[in-house]
Curated annotation (Swiss-Prot):
This is Large ribosomal subunit protein bL35. GO terms for molecular function: structural constituent of ribosome. GO terms for cellular component: cytosolic large ribosomal subunit. The lineage of its organism: Bacteria, Bacillati, Bacillota, Bacilli, Lactobacillales. The gene is rpmI. Disulfide bonds: none annotated. Belongs to the bacterial ribosomal protein bL35 family. GO terms for biological process: translation. Keywords: Ribonucleoprotein, Ribosomal protein. It comes from the Bacteria.
Length: 66
């Protein structure tokens, strides 16, 4: 059976944390900031953790990632 490969697109978007979680960055941050408040733009800059519902699926895609 061949070795499982890391899903490269996912590997670029997620980083593994020290406790084994997955860190992600937020969507809606590339353009059209005039419709967003300063508070919303500031909060979008922060990283976030992958939700519990998505974690299992994403973990399989980046299983071999360090």
């Amino acid at each position: 059976m061949p070795k499982q490969k890391t899903h490269r697109a996912s590997a670029k978007r997620f980083k593994r944390t020290g406790n084994g979680g997955l860190k992600r960055f937020r969507a809606y941050t590339s353009h059209r900031f005039h419709g967003k408040s300063v508070k919303q733009r500031r909060q979008l800059r922060k990283a976030s953790m992958v939700s519990k519902g998505d974690f299992k699926r994403i973990r399989r895609m980046v299983a071999t990632m360090k």
